Amino acid sequence: PALCCTGITPCLPQSQILTSDQSSHFTPRSQLRTIPKGCSVSYNGTFVAKRQTRIAVLPIGYADGYSRQLSHRGSVLIQGRRVPIVGLVCMDMIMVDVTDIAPLEVGETVTLIGQQGKESIWADEVADWIGTIPYEVLCGIGSRVPRLYESA
């Protein structure tokens, strides 16, 4: 029965399910920094900018259930476009490269799982990135993350 609340089915990829019936996961953009070429970010400076780069800091991390395995490999949606996670997923934040999109507003919605415009990232895709199943991705979302349930 709980699967009905998430929109996940073991029979179909999420891209074949009506998007309004699926779980989504959002966060606001909290900070924006421009870093010069050669500057590093994140734990151990694992991301080094190859050019002047705009980095958005998002208030979500592994303490919220956002897997550290998404470090350097996941993406999020901002303004309907995919932007890459750069550096390691930290306890309370992730950083994404927003150099190639329009300027952002503080608090602008960032989609971690869901749809923005014509682009989408669903739990099954996130699961593929980290070698697990969609159920684990959704069950891993921590208790610090508020839930909002909408009726159909």
Residue spans for each PLM region:
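Active-site anion/phosphate-binding pocket segments in diverse small-molecule metabolic enzymes
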Residues: 1-152
